[in-house]
Swiss-Prot record:
GO terms for cellular component: cytosolic large ribosomal subunit. The gene is rplL. This is Large ribosomal subunit protein bL12. InterPro entries: Ribosomal_bL12, Ribosomal_bL12_C, Ribosomal_bL12_C/ClpS-like, Ribosomal_bL12_oligo, Ribosomal_bL12_oligo_N_sf. GO terms for molecular function: mRNA binding; structural constituent of ribosome. GO terms for biological process: translation. Belongs to the bacterial ribosomal protein bL12 family. It comes from the Bacteria. Homodimer. Part of the ribosomal stalk of the 50S ribosomal subunit. Forms a multimeric L10(L12)X complex, where L10 forms an elongated spine to which 2 to 4 L12 dimers bind in a sequential fashion. Binds GTP-bound translation factors. Disulfide bonds: none annotated. It holds the Pfam family Ribosomal_L12. Keywords: Ribonucleoprotein, Ribosomal protein.
Amino acid sequence: MSITKEQILDAISEMSVMNIVELISDMEKKFGVSSIIPSSSTSTQNIETAEAKTEFDVLLKSIGGNKVSVIKAVRSATGLGLKEAKDLVESAPTIIKERITQDAAESLKKILNETGAEVEIK
């Protein structure tokens, strides 16, 4: 004689929450499974985000001590005029360049760091 699903469900419905939690834990151990189901959509989104990251933004966080050198570096990198570059630098934290390759972003970060600026790549 076997027990039906309905009989199992009836027995579980009469149990306390703590007993159900213990039952689930015991079942996980017995069958070597986990009740936590990984969300495939979240995993897929994380993979797509990691693969799709081909464009980067360079964020000027702070100017540092040598504002003139930072302005010159920003002018050179962006092609802005003196006033526009000065205004951009003085508005830190701000994005200096958007949607550039990783190599270009790393190069710009290195140049700006050499002038004493604090830079982050996003």
